[in-house]
Amino acid sequence: MLAWLRGEQDLAKLVKRGLVVGKGFVKMGGVIIDPSHCWHITIGDNVTLAPNVHVLAHDASTKVFLGHTRVANTKIGNNVFVGAGSIILPGVTIGNNVVVGAGSVVTKDIPDGSIAIGNPARVVKSMEAFLEENRQLMKPDNVFDEQFTLRNSSFGEKEREALLAACEKYGVAFVK
C-alpha cells in the first residue's frame, strides 16, 4: 500500500499481466513500465533501470487521428543499465551488454555491446572501449569496497573524506 501511495508500480502485478522479467532485475524509484500494455515488454537478466526510467509499449498519439493506439513489442536484453530519466519508446530492442546514458530517449534499436546516449539515443562507443577507458581510470587509491557506501551502517566522515579526496585527485572514484 505504501508503494502505491508513493506512486510505485507493483512489479508482481505487471508480471501477472504478462510482463517478462529475467533474473537480477533492479527497478529503482519512479520507474514506469507501461502498465496498459506490459505484456509487450520483455526485460532480460541483470537489468537495472535507474530512477525515473519509462519503458513504453504503446503510443497513443495515433488515437486521435486514426482511432487506434499503436502498440509494439519492446525488448531489453541481458546485462543492461538504463540511466536515470531515460525513455524507451515502443518497438525498440536494446541488445545485450548495453549502457543507455541518463536522460536518453531510445527511439531505435541499440545493438549488443554498445554505449548509447542522447535524444535521440545514438551509439557513441563500444562496451569494450567504455570498459577499457574506465579500467584506465581505476587507481589503487580511488577504488573502494562496500565499506565506502551507505550500505555500510558505520559509513562516516572518514569514508566520505576518502571518497572526496579521490574524486578531487582523479576526477572520479569507484565504489563496490
What are the residue ranges of the model-derived segments?
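Terminal amphipathic alpha-helical/low-complexity segments used for targeting or macromolecular assembly
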Residues: 1-18, 121-176
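Short beta->alpha connector loops
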Residues: 8, 30-39
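Short N-terminal helix-initiation segments at or just after the protein's N-terminus
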Residues: 16-29, 60, 174
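Left-handed beta-helix
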Residues: 23, 28-29, 34, 44-45, ...
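Flexible, solvent-exposed loop segments that connect beta-strands
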Residues: 62-68
